[in-house]
A protein has these predicted regions:
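Short helix/loop capping segments that flank catalytic or ligand/cofactor-binding pockets
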Residues: 18-19, 143-144
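Hydrophobic repeat-domain scaffold segments
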Residues: 13, 76, 88, 146-178
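Generic preference for well-ordered alpha-helical elements
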Residues: 13-16, 34, 69
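Extended helical regulatory/linker subdomains that flank P-loop NTPase cores
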Residues: 24-26, 30, 42-143, 150-153
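Catalytic-loop motifs flanking and including active-site residues across diverse enzymes
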Residues: 15, 71, 140-141, 167, ...
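A ubiquitous short alpha-helical element
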Residues: 2-6, 57-63, 157-161
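Short, mixed-charge aromatic SLiMs
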Residues: 5-7, 36-50, 96-104, 163-174
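Amphipathic alpha-helical segments of the small helical/lid subdomains adjacent to P-loop NTPase cores
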Residues: 1-18, 113-114
Length: 178
């Protein structure tokens, strides 16, 4: 109610739909921003296709939800730490995704194929131009980057590096309650 970070989620049909699903489920929205985003991600990863009557049988669909979330965290933090950047050059994104999959023994997926499947499945990451991608909303990148920094015990390092940059306020807002 009146939270600008939540209000910005109403700017796109996909994100507005997620808020409506959350509200319909509980007849209210979570008070904590991190809880709202956690639920929205859960809905996208677990319920989005099912609610629309889809069942996909792809390599991406066979990845565990935890692996998917860890991949999003890794990509969000990688690109955030480089500037921070909310737009990802396609070639670099494909390369990072492929190396992440190899490093963690995930099914033999190419980075390009995996990102395209993510885009088709639920749109957490989407094409933003002919040769670049981004998270469907900057706040998703902030949320996943914050989760990465906290789970890897790098939140203090991030705060020391970026504390004076306004563009980092969103990540910091997510780090505090995590």
């Amino acid at each position: 109610k009146g939270d600008p970070s939540v209000t910005t989620l109403t700017e796109t049909p996909l994100l507005l739909s997620l808020l409506c699903i959350q509200f319909r489920h509980d007849l209210s929205l979570p008070q904590r921003k991190t809880e709202l985003y956690r639920r929205c991600v859960d809905t996208l990863l677990r319920d989005w296709d099912a609610s629309r009557g889809f069942r996909r049988d792809t390599a991406y669909a066979k990845l565990s939800d935890e692996r998917k979330e860890r991949l999003f965290e890794f990509l969000a933090a990688e690109f955030f730490s480089k500037g921070p950047s909310f737009t990802f050059p396609q070639d670099e994104l494909f390369k990072l995704t492929g190396s992440y999959c190899e490093r963690f023994g995930m099914p033999n997926l190419g980075g390009a194929e995996l990102i395209k499947e993510i885009e088709r499945h639920h749109g957490i990451i989407e094409r933003s131009s002919m040769d670049s991608f981004s998270f469907s909303h900057p706040s998703f990148q902030e949320y996943f980057a914050a989760r990465y920094y906290v789970s890897h015990h790098k939140e203090m390092e991030m705060l020391k590096t970026f504390h004076d940059r306004d563009i980092c306020a969103g990540v910091i807002e997510f780090i505090i309650p995590l």
